[in-house]
């Protein structure tokens, strides 16, 4: 609970919206709601995946960010060209902490920035020849790359360059997979369309290449981890549990993933989807074309991890189900010790979240395992099926906010007064300057992993370290304290 009744939260929403002109106020009102877990269809009370109001300080990203920054960028043995001006590639380089195994610049390229560095003359005369030359240079300088993706920035779509033709010609010439991705930033309303475009590019240019490959030896226990970007090593801590219960992870993508793993994914028996929002499209495609079932899972916190492990094991035979219970029993003392240590220090603390992807709902259980309560949550780029899932996880009369503006978020925080905020880098310093403990929940504030039982110990430590840091008791300047004491003495 927010500590406020349903009527009070509804009143708060209206108070915050009062500053807007009528048109903007009506639009934003549709994106804010008081949660009711009994509601089965979120569209009855909140809308999402709509264009942000011009002039409002949205926290969203663009389609290029969704494609290059999320889906394609972490594939380690491919070179991802930011085709356009230098800024987009530079500002999206290495920011998400997608861990990988490999030698950077030799057989892994995740943290490097490859750009066609568009200039004015390229806008005037087109950049197809420049792109072809760049691909040749990349092949000469980095011969161990296994493929190339061309991530289009805004000017490419505006001037009508034919990146598909260049990719086909150079791919045939070099006998290498070269994938054109039409992810210009102006497309769609957020980075969500970039995810979809990237999924479609995987479908059209990568999947199917090894369908006739008979050298791959399948087993009944082959799975693929999809939609885990290995931030801080998340995919590794998840993979440990799956392999301990007897499953074989043929592919994980895109964090620490390779193009070969993606090509082999149609041969697995089950696709395990962590980030539903960014990877449900390709999972549905593989279900339709190859008959591969898929399921969501949640490895944040022991309660949800155990639920997910059992749900995954139920898709296989009794031997896997038995090993699953053995894995759960093995790690039980470990996570119980974490709860015993940190729950007394965190019990009753209230959290507000504003993130993207899956986290606004997936991390709720991890906080609850520590005795904390999420009193407000929202997504940057959700669709209504995300809110359908979220409303069941949130308590009654808690606050939901879609594409929340900087102003709205600050005002909600001032009134609800959470003990902790989990959001992104753009919000971090605003709330820290307000004296509110904050965790950057896009890339784990240079920490992690947070997935699985191992990750839960780090998650709990980080929340305790943030909330119970003695610095929050020292925010008042010494001269302000002395002035206050003088006033008290004078009044006495």
Curated annotation (Swiss-Prot):
Cofactor detail note: Binds 1 [8Fe-7S] cluster per heterodimer. Binds 1 [7Fe-Mo-9S-C-homocitryl] cluster per subunit.
EC number(s) on file: 1.18.6.1
Keywords, ordered alphabetically: ATP-binding, Iron, Iron-sulfur, Metal-binding, Molybdenum, Nitrogen fixation, Nucleotide-binding, Oxidoreductase
Induction: Constitutively expressed during log and stationary phase in sucrose-limited cultures, its levels decrease during stationary phase (at protein level).
Pfam families, A to Z: Oxidored_nitro
Keyword Oxidoreductase in annotation: yes
Regulation affecting activity: Nitrogenase holoenzyme is subject to 'conformational protection' by FeSII; under oxidizing conditions FeSII binds to the holoenzyme and reversibly protects it from oxidation.
GO biological process: nitrogen fixation
Cofactor(s) recorded in Swiss-Prot or TrEMBL: [8Fe-7S] cluster; [7Fe-Mo-9S-C-homocitryl] cluster
General function of this protein: This molybdenum-iron protein is part of the nitrogenase complex that catalyzes the key enzymatic reactions in nitrogen fixation.
Name this protein carries in UniProt: Nitrogenase molybdenum-iron protein alpha chain
Biological source species: Azotobacter vinelandii
Biological classification of the source: Bacteria, Pseudomonadati, Pseudomonadota, Gammaproteobacteria, Pseudomonadales
Gene name in the database record: nifD
């Amino acid at each position: 609970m927010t500590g406020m009744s349903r009527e009070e939260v509804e009143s708060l929403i209206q108070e915050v919206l009062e500053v807007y002109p009528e048109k903007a106020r009506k639009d934003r009102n549709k994106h804010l709601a008081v949660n009711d877990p009994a509601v089965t269809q979120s569209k009855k009370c909140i809308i999402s995946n709509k264009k942000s109001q011009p002039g409002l300080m949205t926290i969203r990203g663009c389609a290029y960010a969704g494609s290059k920054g999320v889906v394609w960028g972490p594939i380690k043995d491919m070179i991802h060209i930011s085709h356009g001006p230098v800024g987009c590639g530079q500002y999206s380089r290495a920011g998400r902490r997608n861990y990988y195994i490999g030698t950077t610049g030799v057989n892994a390229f995740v943290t490097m920035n490859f750009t066609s560095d568009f200039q004015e003359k390229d806008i005037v005369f087109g950049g197809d020849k420049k792109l072809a030359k760049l691909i040749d240079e990349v092949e000469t300088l980095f011969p161990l790359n296994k493929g190339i993706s061309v991530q289009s920035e805004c000017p490419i779509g505006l001037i009508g360059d034919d990146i598909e033709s260049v990719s086909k010609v150079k791919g045939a010439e070099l006998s290498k997979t070269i994938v054109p991705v039409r992810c210009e930033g102006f497309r769609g309303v957020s980075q969500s369309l970039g995810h979809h475009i990237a999924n479609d590019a995987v479908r059209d240019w990568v999947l199917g290449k090894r369908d006739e490959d008979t050298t791959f030896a399948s087993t009944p226990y082959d799975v693929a981890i999809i939609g885990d970007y290995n931030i801080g090593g998340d995919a590794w801590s998840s993979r440990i549990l799956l392999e301990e219960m007897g499953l074989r992870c043929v592919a994980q993508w895109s964090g620490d993933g390779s193009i070969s793993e993606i090509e082999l994914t149609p041969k697995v028996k089950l696709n395990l989807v962590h980030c539903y929002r960014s990877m449900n499209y390709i999972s549905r495609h593989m279900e339709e074309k190859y008959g591969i079932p898929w399921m969501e899972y949640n490895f944040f916190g022991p309660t949800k991890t155990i639920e997910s492990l059992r749900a995954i094991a139920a898709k296989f035979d009794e031997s896997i189900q038995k090993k699953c219970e053995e894995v759960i029993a093995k790690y039980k003392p470990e996570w119980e010790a974490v709860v015993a240590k940190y729950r007394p220090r965190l019990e009753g603390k209230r959290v507000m979240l504003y993130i993207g992807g899956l986290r606004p709902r997936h991390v709720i259980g991890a906080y609850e395992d520590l005795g904390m309560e999420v009193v407000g949550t929202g997504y940057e780029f959700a669709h209504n099926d995300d809110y359908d899932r979220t409303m069941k996880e949130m308590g009654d009369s808690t606050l939901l906010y879609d594409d929340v503006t900087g102003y709205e978020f600050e005002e909600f925080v001032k009134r609800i007064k959470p003990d902790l905020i989990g959001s992104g880098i753009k919000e971090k310093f605003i709330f820290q300057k307000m004296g509110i403990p904050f965790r950057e929940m896009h890339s784990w504030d240079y920490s992690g992993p947070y997935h699985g039982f191992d990750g839960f110990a780090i998650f709990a430590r980080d929340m305790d370290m943030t909330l119970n840091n003695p610095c929050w008791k020292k925010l008042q300047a010494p001269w302000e304290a002395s002035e206050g004491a003088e006033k008290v003495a004078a009044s006495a």
